[in-house]
Amino acid sequence: MKQGIHPDYREVVFQDMSNGFKFITRSTIQTRETIELDGKTYPLAKIEVSSESHSFYTGQQKIMDTAGRVEKFKNKFGARASGKAAK
């Protein structure tokens, strides 16, 4: 294998921001934050949803705080977006 062309494959902590669940896995993700877990320092990757919080795996319906994005887009670009689609 050529040296210096492969990404750094290492242990990384992923933290589910919706419930605080953390798990360690191997990844090439680049992060700026670190966390100490079990006496060892790991890079920290923050994620919005994991198997611990996703409704498919938990069996519970959960409302995400994403409502209103379409309305904001329509308010901001509604006239221009609908005008181009009509042509």
From Swiss-Prot:
Pfam families: Ribosomal_L31 (PF01197). GO terms for cellular component: ribonucleoprotein complex; ribosome. GO terms for molecular function: structural constituent of ribosome. InterPro entries: Ribosomal_bL28/bL31-like_sf, Ribosomal_bL31, Ribosomal_bL31_B, Ribosomal_bL31_sf. One of its GO terms (biological process) is translation. Keywords: Ribonucleoprotein, Ribosomal protein. Part of the 50S ribosomal subunit. Belongs to the bacterial ribosomal protein bL31 family. Type B subfamily. This is Large ribosomal subunit protein bL31B. The lineage of its organism: Bacteria, Pseudomonadati, Pseudomonadota, Betaproteobacteria, Burkholderiales. The gene is rpmE2.
